[in-house]
Amino acid sequence: MTSAPKARIAITYCTQCMWMLRAGWMAQELLSTFGTELGEVALVPGTGGIFEVTCNGELIWERKRDGGFPEAKVLKQRVRDIIDPERDLGHSDRKAGDPA
């Protein structure tokens, strides 16, 4: 029995800007939430102010395009929308003011 391929996340960050810790934190957040549903979370060093996140090759966050860095909950929602759209992310899906 062959299982479906697991998602690959790549976080490309600017080494000149020293964004490795931010990229690592985002990777940790995704791994904590999705665990074994992810096949890989890669940190990819880059330059020139880059901070991009892809899921299975699809660009889901780009710092310049999207106006800065993602909040963890937004990034989790975008990954979820690709790998498991029916999944409830619990508190990460609730808006401010929604009942708990």
Residue ranges and their predicted role:
Residues 85-100:
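C-terminal helix/juxtamembrane-tail motif
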Residues 59-87:
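Non-catalytic, surface beta->alpha helical segment in thiol-disulfide oxidoreductase systems
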Residues 18-19, 51-52, 61:
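Eukaryotic short linear interaction motifs
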Residues 4-6, 46-48, 70:
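Eukaryote-biased feature marking scaffold/signaling PDZ-domain proteins and nuclear chromatin regulators
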